[in-house]
Amino acid sequence: MRNHRTSIFVVLSLVIILNGQSGFLPRAGAESKVHIVYLGEKQHDDPEFVTESHHRMLWSLLGSKEEAHGSMVHSFRHGFSGFAAKLTESQAKKIADLPEVVHVIPDRFYKPATTRTWDYLGLSPTNPKNLLNQTNMGEQMIIGIIDSGVWPESEVFNDNEIGPVPSHWKGGCESGEDFNSSHCNKKLIGAKYFINAFLATHESFNSSESLDFISPRGYNGHGTHVATIAGGSYVPNTSYKGLAGGTVRGGAPRARIAVYKTCWYLDLDIAACSSADILKAMDEAIHDGVDVLSLSLGFEPLYPETDVRDGIATGAFHAVLKGITVVCAAGNAGPAAQTVGNTAPWILTVAATTLDRSFVTPMTLGNNKVILGQAIYTGTEVGFTSLVYPENPGNSNESFSGTCERLLINSNRTMAGKVVLCFTESPYSISVTRAAHYVKRAGGLGVIIAGQPGNVLRPCLDDFPCVAVDYELGTYILFYIRSNGSPVVKIQPSRTLIGQPVGTKVASFSSRGPNPISAAILKPDIAAPGVSILAATTTNTTFNDRGFIFLSGTSMATPTISGIVALLKALHPDWSPAAIRSAIVTTAWRTDPFGEQIFAEGSPRKPADPFDYGGGLVNPEKATKPGLVYDLGLEDYVLYMCSVGYNETSISQLVGKGTVCSYPKPSVLDFNLPSITIPNLKEEVTLPRTLTNVGPLESVYRVAVEPPLGTQVTVTPETLVFNSTTKRVSFKVSVSTTHKINTGYYFGSLTWSDSLHNVTIPLSVRTQLLPYYYDEN
């Protein structure tokens, strides 16, 4: 029997992905480790034939069938061709030299990165003519979730009033530990797990002490949580101990969910997801017939490499060519620049914002001043109690006074029976846990943590009052303590505040652009709510209330977009993944739903720009009728690959047909994205874009430009005319600079408008008069 222990740290590990720490990655064996041998587009429709060809290739390398069989980890045979195998470095180099091999990718490990969201985004079921009801809530769509598994008993997987399984579904439910096919129904229609590559590196995982279930069942609730957000069924009367009350539902509440488990728990607080297992899951999902793939996973940006060595990007490319939109998390390494992950231009990459909701926690000081902090505190009121600031706690160094991290060395006499104020430079998610533990252990009754906004709230163990404020409010409280002989404070339980005056912000943890791999490709693409999202979890998870929990991260924003993509695909089944992305990006809000400026949380807080949120905050209803789209097909992706230096042989194998790159090499600026990013402007640059009409046949659009500061932007022609015979029209954009020095990025926009639609793309331009120059001054 496995020991399925529960710990707060398990929850914390999945709230934030891409935290920049890779120390948990296992060391490879002395002789061999898992490599992905990628062969490009499959050359045969019979999957058994494809797999046999993989074994023959490995046999020819290793010299015997037995060694080939023992080395093989996965065969990719549906969406594309390739395999994962345990190889030494010399074997990997030898097989990489074979002409039929596109490239060999060393296995790497990724990490896993509601009641209000959908009303906030204007996607309410009460409007009979909106996107939800026009698509029957996505009933014929299948959303593939590649994550940490699922808790099938959750109410969000009920199949009440849902019709038969869509006819294009070809997948199934695999049995395993505490999971069998009876756990699937007309909502949860598929469940598989992929562990071979993980086990190749973590052979001891099979021991009885392993936390996780070797099956589609998830030990931690991360996979269940993201599945809820994307396509969970209606569950009324939910809340977290009275906070955020309402009905939990997914973006496409009647869509079907197929779960592909690739993430496994190594320890109480660590999960790892092998890129080879992820790639195998994507291959199976393509075969099974999913319409959308949602991956709340990521890795630090692969700075020295291109997307050819990124397993998710490789699988996503083949999925997109087969009409499947792939939605991925931007990552949680913000607010620093150039931290965005999942940067391949065929992936829809998602940043995270707050909602128009907060959990205010009133604190009344002895001078009757009420401070509204933030917390998820659902305990009883703490009546007027002594308030203390630990001055110089047991150390002669005054710089330690009042710091949350030094509360451990304070005497119990200072904090016992009191509420403690402390200051921190650490991320809130770390400091609050430590400070609450120290104060509670010393007999304190509550803690107020002053620090930089972190956008990550979670309750403290045993409903201990732990309230967050910023430095300004913390300093006010400190002045009150120092100016009063007997300072006191009263802490009331948290309350849910919705709507105005709560503003929308890009979360501080959300990873930022510019794109560190290919600067001319704007990332992230779009933003969606991802802060304090209430959704389902496993019942053994700390901080759950009746199987529901708050989590934050771009992990939560990603399935929000996945649910919207499912609805758009149901409404427009002929739209390509690129057309769907364009519709989402060009119709996004650049202000919040109340018309107010969206800010980006950071140091300092600033107005949000395209490197924070891409096109803006997703606007689902507007995306149904974008008017025009910036579409992409195979030829466009080939242009991109030629422009960034893929060799012709690799491109030919990747796309399954002979390819010759033009000379001179095309510019990546010509790639038909719903954005224009010019990272190195010196001389005037002219670049093309093509728009496809998906609105009224007879349409006339006129251009309006907001040029980035210090640039001149000219569009030719200034008017686009569409009719029954002209559905695609191209235009050119010329950009020049008036700056006399190297600059940072400035931002603007380009909008095509008729009487019904505004088709807006962001402009991001940096002047570089001295090219290839790093300015550290």
Curated annotation (Swiss-Prot):
UniProt cross-references to SUPFAM superfamilies, sorted A to Z: Subtilisin-like
InterPro entries documented for this protein: Peptidase_S8/S53_dom, Peptidase_S8/S53_dom_sf, Peptidase_S8_Ser-AS, Peptidase_S8_subtilisin-rel, Peptidases_S8_3, S8pro/Inhibitor_I9, S8pro/Inhibitor_I9_sf, SBT
Signal peptide location in the record? 1-22
* The protein's Enzyme Commission number: 3.4.21.-
One GO cellular component term, please give it.
extracellular region
All residue ranges annotated as the Peptidase S8 domain in the record: 117-624
Annotated active site residues, numbered on this chain, are D147 (charge relay system), H222 (charge relay system), S555 (charge relay system)
Domain called PA: residue spans: 386-481
A Pfam family hit: Inhibitor_I9
Instruction: Please give the Gene Ontology molecular function terms for this protein.
Output: serine-type endopeptidase activity
What residues make up the propeptide removed on maturation? 23-113
Span of domain Inhibitor I9: 34-111
UniProt keyword Signal present:
yes
The record's Gene Ontology biological-process terms are: proteolysis
Q: Using the UniProt annotation, give the residues that carry a glycan (glycosylation sites).
A: N133, N180, N206, N237, N397, N412, N540, N647, N723, N758
Query: Where does it localize?
Result: Secreted
Give the source's domain of life in one word.
Answer: Eukaryota
The record's keywords, sorted A to Z, are: Autocatalytic cleavage, Glycoprotein, Hydrolase, Protease, Secreted, Serine protease, Signal, Zymogen
Broadest EC class assigned to this enzyme:
hydrolase
Q: Which Gene3D superfamilies match?
A: 2.60.40.2310, 3.50.30.30, Peptidase S8 propeptide/proteinase inhibitor I9, Peptidase S8/S53 domain
Main location (coarse class): secreted
Q: Which family does it belong to?
A: Belongs to the peptidase S8 family.
Protein name in UniProt: Subtilisin-like protease SBT3.7
